[in-house]
Amino acid sequence: EKELTEQKYPFKHVYTGISKTVKRALPLKAIKRIKELDLTLKPHLDYARDVFLFSFYTRGMSFIDMAYLKKSDLKNGVIIYRRKKTGQQLTIKWEKCMEDIIAKYNGCSTTQYLLPIITNPCADERMQYRNAISRINVALKEVARLAGLNMPLTMHCARHCWASIA
């Protein structure tokens, strides 16, 4: 009779599944706290907060798409733009909350872009985008602290917030 060997399971302590991702979404009351912060004495934080909220208001628009959003993309009460990542065309109804943010920074950019992210037509656009997202993410961490949030705030959070609330 053949002898049976005991099963050894050499990888029983090795995790081979998919680990749970950290939730990046904030509850609506946290978004409200961010919105209601008085940042008038800290314009760089005010700007970062506004860009974050603009992303949230525009159904979680990615920062790259916001950076390259043109004034001509806004027509007849809608924004029509093509996602950089996928090429998918999206249409978003233009709301007063979006208008308020754009109006606040209206004189800041003489470029074709809607938001003052890429502001220097003579400089490399990709570099301006990278520098802007870096500065804004640093500022958003301070905004989160001032709002009493116990998680770091980033531009990517705005996408998750919208997706979890929608």
Regions found by a protein language model. Give the residues of each.
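Basic, Lys/Arg- and aromatic-enriched nucleic-acid-binding interface segment
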Residues: 4-63
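Conserved tyrosine-mediated DNA breakage-rejoining catalytic core shared by Y-recombinases
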Residues: 6, 12-13, 58, 68-104
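Short, contiguous acidic/charged loop-to-helix segments that flank catalytic cores in large enzymes
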Residues: 21, 39-43, 80-93, 123-132, ...
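Generic recognition of stable, solvent-exposed alpha-helical segments in well-folded globular domains
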Residues: 26-29, 46-49, 61, 93-100, ...
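Active-site lining segments that contact anionic ligands and/or coordinate catalytic metals
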Residues: 29-31, 48-53, 76, 87-89, ...
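Active-site/catalytic core of tyrosine-dependent DNA strand-transfer enzymes
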Residues: 30-31, 95-150
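Short, basic (Lys/Arg/His-rich) helix/loop patches that form interaction surfaces
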Residues: 36, 40-43, 108, 137-166
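Short alpha-helical segment immediately N-terminal to, or the first helix within
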Residues: 54-55, 69, 165-166
